[in-house]
Amino acid sequence: MNMSLSRIVKAAPLRRTTLAMALGALGAAPAAYADWNNQSIIKAGERQHGIHIKQSDGAGVRTATGTTIKVSGRQAQGVLLENPAAELRFQNGSVTSSGQLFDEGVRRFLGTVTVKAGKLVADHATLANVSDTRDDDGIALYVAGEQAQASIADSTLQGAGGVRVERGANVTVQRSTIVDGGLHIGTLQPLQPEDLPPSRVVLGDTSVTAVPASGAPAAVFVFGANELTVDGGHITGGRAAGVAAMDGAIVHLQRATIRRGDAPAGGAVPGGAVPGGAVPGGFGPLLDGWYGVDVSDSTVDLAQSIVEAPQLGAAIRAGRGARVTVSGGSLSAPHGNVIETGGGARRFPPPASPLSITLQAGARAQGRALLYRVLPEPVKLTLAGGAQGQGDIVATELPPIPGASSGPLDVALASQARWTGATRAVDSLSIDNATWVMTDNSNVGALRLASDGSVDFQQPAEAGRFKVLMVDTLAGSGLFRMNVFADLGLSDKLVVMRDASGQHRLWVRNSGSEPASGNTMLLVQTPRGSAATFTLANKDGKVDIGTYRYRLAANGNGQWSLVGAKAPPAPKPAPQPGPQPGPQPPQPPQPPQPPQPPQPPQRQPEAPAPQPPAGRELSAAANAAVNTGGVGLASTLWYAESNALSKRLGELRLNPDAGGAWGRGFAQRQQLDNRAGRRFDQKVAGFELGADHAVAVAGGRWHLGGLAGYTRGDRGFTGDGGGHTDSVHVGGYATYIANSGFYLDATLRASRLENDFKVAGSDGYAVKGKYRTHGVGVSLEAGRRFAHADGWFLEPQAELAVFRVGGGAYRAANGLRVRDEGGSSVLGRLGLEVGKRIELAGGRQVQPYIKASVLQEFDGAGTVRTNGIAHRTELRGTRAELGLGMAAALGRGHSLYASYEYSKGPKLAMPWTFHAGYRYSW
């Protein structure tokens, strides 16, 4: 029975050919044969193929749907196509082979499915080579010849030899899986004729895997002038690489992910090592590790792809003549090298040609080394189009391969690209509208900057870890971002050894610490007489360092340093010529002096606290700290809260013998000059609530009550930023109103003040500081009203207020140490109020008035220290005050009051103050 089945299967091709010839004689189109549909074909003999379409079988389309093919004989292939005019459509079936296929005698490859001529269309199929051998004997699909084509979709191709395409064949694989042996395109150069057309392979959303047991050097291996296009999918494994392109290959990878998978470390292959320590196909020693993409004398383009490398190896290895372009996507080698140059194809050393690696269109690369040059071959690395690279650029000092010439390592950063790392290996570096973040000491041969290209000395994690950039030549125009460590007397430095030219800017990060000694910090050293110029890019051309600001100055010897931004001293008058002295008579010798008794040791006086040098400009943080601290600021808030009796209680005389509850709001603009910091403005606003009880006594009455309120002060430091204070206060008061017109008012308040500031330093970064303090104050006001019968009145007033605020210590965000020592204020006021009481219908009254006062601050001084340097703040002085207001009794215990004031003094001015309040009396 088995013999009969074998004869039937073997005879089928002949009958199909005869039928095709008959139809052709009648002028009919070639038919689609269906003889292999839903069949199970099993063969065990040598070269007993499952389906064999010979060149003599004629043209046409054959189909095999739902068919299972199993062959096990030596050189037996499940499907063999040798007719260039034939097409086999294989759907929903499987083809399996298990016999030895490789012909050692003629070095001929065979596969479970072999296409030498014609076209194979496989859909939802499984092509598997299950032989227990590897590599050459384990090919699942072999397509070879310029008349050979294959189109695979939604299928699985499995075998230790994977899929092999060569000799001008064209293959397309969509939404499929290639497992075990990977994909091989092309043959080794000695086996490939020079005039052979290139093979072309297209993979779409296809997964390719090469397991270690297969011995495949790469999951995808393209050799010679062949072309591979990948759009989507995963490439995993490979003994030494994920994708290898050598000897003229062209590879396009788009939306691909390349990973090593579970391959053993070091590229070791189970079952033994390759003789000579090299991987077939020209790979370097296995000790080099695994490479995501290995390129030599070929072109590889990666677009929006992901390449991940393990600890040993690199994401990309570029050998001689490699041209690699990475557009978008990412290259990752967290424990190794992103790019390694100077390897690959070492068995075939062509003349050395420049290696070109370009990262562009937002590509990201990260590793311990961004580029590791193994051999001294010419290398050009370019980052452009917003690409970001992280890792050092380093080179080994290995001897070159015989016949290979050495060349420079050139790096170009352009179009908003960014490289973060250090180097001692770069011969030339150009930075054009891009940034190099230098993480450690570095040496560069020629450095050229253009279009705001910048070198950013990375801010260190530890103080004192300054960096030095040494270059042979400097040219162009760019920006250097640098750090200073003032308390250690250290800073980042740029050192030019041979020649410096161009106009450059230095941007120096602010430092909250104070210089250790002197006022000079060296930043740039150039050869004497060089043409390069440097300016500060910080705001206003100054740098905030500790308490003061510094500017950049050259000393004429090629050194550029930061010096204190100090006003130049007034020139001394030239000495006037005087009479020339005549000859002096000789002086007689002096008699010897008797020895002096020893003096007792004198006690050395304590060193005074450092004082601010005259004319020095405060840094933004120090200025904010000085203007936020001291008694001056706190006292202005406290006086805005207390103010005069009439603004707190309205006109108590309008509702005699009545206690009540009241509330008021106020707003005020202040202009302060405390003589230590720069002038600043402050807007104060708040409210206050209170209630009192009236107690009648002989000749008048007392109002005894309590109060509570909230005040906010918002400060603006011109050109720097601002700050604010939140004040919450409680207190009590006692007010005496005499029938004779005399009054006396006493208050006691306790306040809690929350102070903070946020300013922009000269480097543009925000500096914050905050602290809490407390204050307490008392006031006593007295006066007497002289009233006229027609309602006019005249009221002289006198007031004395004493306020004491505590201090606080804190450290600003930039490290500036601040200590506010608090202080006291004693304010006196003499005033005169003139107004008129107007009676209205229904018992209502209106009382407008104007007032003039003179105020004298008798103390108002405090000390604020920044990094131990004392700054004396004080508002002592006289100011005048003018005001007008009105109080109104609306009947039934309701009254309103409002006022406006203007005050002017040399240290404190108040362009406007508004009060408004309401009182209900019972």
Swiss-Prot record:
Residues 561-619 are annotated as: Disordered. Residues 266-290 are annotated as: 4 X 5 AA tandem repeats of G-G-A-V-P. It comes from Bordetella parapertussis (strain 12822 / ATCC BAA-587 / NCTC 13253). NCBIfam families: autotrans_barl (TIGR01414). This is Pertactin autotransporter. Keywords: Cell adhesion, Cell outer membrane, Membrane, Periplasm, Repeat, Secreted, Signal, Transmembrane, Transmembrane beta strand, Virulence. The signal peptide, cleaved at the inner membrane, guides the autotransporter protein to the periplasmic space. Then, insertion of the C-terminal translocator domain in the outer membrane forms a hydrophilic pore for the translocation of the passenger domain to the bacterial cell surface, with subsequent cleavage. PANTHER family: C-TERMINAL REGION OF AIDA-LIKE PROTEIN (PTHR35037:SF3). Residues 1-34 form the signal peptide.
